[in-house]
């Protein structure tokens, strides 16, 4: 194990210092997989690899790498965003505080594909870091992506919206749900596929959230779907009716 650690670190140092930017980038593309190699290692992940992932010098006493410059390179930023869940999973939720600021900076990255990658894995991050950290750090990200300037980012997050909400405490999930009807009628009024992404989750959310939905948001969303000008959404609204009655009857 120690030999493997040393060899990997030597290789990554050499590749990071290569004269070719393409070689450096190709090496960095492997960073998530290399870090994951240590998920069962009793000594944990070498700190040098974590620092490399964060855009810092591999040795703590070195100075040089500018994290701001590192993140402005969209290729590197996208690699970090894509590998974030795997790296946090390997390091464990107790190390989230170390990576949190880097994650937050990526959520406001200028390049849409970087934010889109984070939106795609938001529900996975919630499962990894747990409800408390999710409420503190990921709900603000979710709120931001609900209104992202890029429709694709919002659409990507909405694909797994139900999984994200079911990771939250009941009250936090209710607060998230409370925002959605207004978004349907304003931000998403001219984006039918965003409305469809929301509507698609309603049948699955009704059995788990309806009885705690004191504000009636799920009923409101069902009615909005039933009255939507898009036929596919009206069909989803129709599906919601028997599920709603069944849920009330069973409880």
What are these regions (language model features)?
Residues 1-251:
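Extended, low-complexity, acidic/polar intrinsically disordered regions
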């Amino acid at each position: 194990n120690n030999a493997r650690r040393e060899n990997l670190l030597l290789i990554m140092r050499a590749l990071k210092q290569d004269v070719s930017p393409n070689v450096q980038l190709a090496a960095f593309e492997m960073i998530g997989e290399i870090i994951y190699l240590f998920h069962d290692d009793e000594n944990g992940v070498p700190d040098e690899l974590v620092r490399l992932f964060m855009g810092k010098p591999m040795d703590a006493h070195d100075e040089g790498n500018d994290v701001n410059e590192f993140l402005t390179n969209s290729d590197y930023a996208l690699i970090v965003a894509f590998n974030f869940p795997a790296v946090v999973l390997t390091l464990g939720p107790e190390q989230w505080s170390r990576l949190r600021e880097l994650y937050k900076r990526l959520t406001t990255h200028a390049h849409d594909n970087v934010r889109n990658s984070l939106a795609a894995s938001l529900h996975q991050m919630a499962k990894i870091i747990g409800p408390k950290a999710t409420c503190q750090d990921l709900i603000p990200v979710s709120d931001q992506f609900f209104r992202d300037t890029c429709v694709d980012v919002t659409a990507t997050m909405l694909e797994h919206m139900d999984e994200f909400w079911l990771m939250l405490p009941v009250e936090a999930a209710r607060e998230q749900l409370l925002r959605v009807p207004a978004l349907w009628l304003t931000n998403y009024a001219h984006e039918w596929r965003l409305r469809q992404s929301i509507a698609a989750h309603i049948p699955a959310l009704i059995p788990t959230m309806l009885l705690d939905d004191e504000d009636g948001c799920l009923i409101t969303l069902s009615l909005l779907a039933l009255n939507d000008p898009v036929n596919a959404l009206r069909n989803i609204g129709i599906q919601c009716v028997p599920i709603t009655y069944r849920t009330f009857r069973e409880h």
